[in-house]
């Protein structure tokens, strides 16, 4: 990423020698040039906390400054010690690395189904489309029937007639099925892009991907298959063909926290608060932001994120997700959040592959990271 700045330039000597290879004289020489120092945005305290919380599980943690987009932590597990490559690596070490679950893969930059964390995007599309207001209510039920197929509520039963705030707090699938069918996949894809899905830079890091929210036209082009109403239903709750990277998840929730600005993630401190990384307006209205925030706060105050409301840290806001994985594997666990609520400073995203429920595996990791940040912040001024 920064080799050009760090490595400098080799020096050289041009020497005349005789037939025996003995030096006769120096014809010319070029002095070496030292490399430049590079300061990263990473907070070593938060980075360690994220890695320790992940505890070598397959997954990722990303923490951003909600105002500037500076990457404060980016952990991917399982990890490895890169210092072993400063010398000749032994065969045993290489075999041990190969036995692990692909430690060379930066999972912070890989696409995953975002599950219910994506309901932030669907809420935005619903209200900003004009087809719903922030005060709209819909009836929920144990399931809805679409194209002869039943799409179920995650809790088994409905939640009655509710609005967006409670739909986020309860994570009602049948509420968001209806929103998705009303606004359509194109609107969802449009607002997902504005919030950072598929439009967030990987900061020059190799081996990553970008998220995507396929539309009917793209599905036809990529797979040669028509779009079904069931595809829209799945998209609305972050399943099906939707893919989002943990970095993009953090960008989305940062935009909710900072007033609707899509931050530009970056790793070099020299890029902070420069035109290159200036946050971009998403066009979200204040009422939309307030509605989503109230739902995310409710998740922490009494919903699936209530482990974060134990009094050990200031009040935060967030959303859990539990993503289905093909092949009968255990679900992926997700969490996105920001804090503190009264003065948002950091946003984070957590995924644990095959971790089960978001509240079970991802929320405890988020709690440890938030706690590390807030404990440090009590003895240090807030982020700029």
Kindly label every feature range from the protein language model.
Residues 2, 256, 365-373:
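Short amphipathic C-terminal alpha-helix that caps PH/PH-like domains
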Residues 20-59:
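Conserved, well-ordered alpha-helix/loop/beta-strand core segments that scaffold catalytic motifs
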Residues 61-66:
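Short hydrophobic alpha-helical segments used for membrane anchoring or interfacial signaling
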Residues 18-25, 67-116, 121-354, 358, ...:
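Beta-lactam-recognizing serine transpeptidase/beta-lactamase-like catalytic domain environment
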Residues 1-35, 236, 350, 367:
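Small/polar-residue-rich segments within soluble enzyme cores
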